[in-house]
Amino acid sequence: PYLLNLPPEK
């Protein structure tokens, strides 16, 4: 999914 493509928002 596209969610996995997003970077980790720390």
UniProtKB/Swiss-Prot annotation:
This protein's name: Unknown protein 8 from 2D-PAGE
Miscellaneous comment in the UniProt entry for this protein: On the 2D-gel the determined MW of this unknown protein is: 65 kDa.
Phylogenetic classification of the source organism: Bacteria, Bacillati, Bacillota, Bacilli, Lactobacillales
Record's note on what induces expression: By elevated hydrostatic pressure.
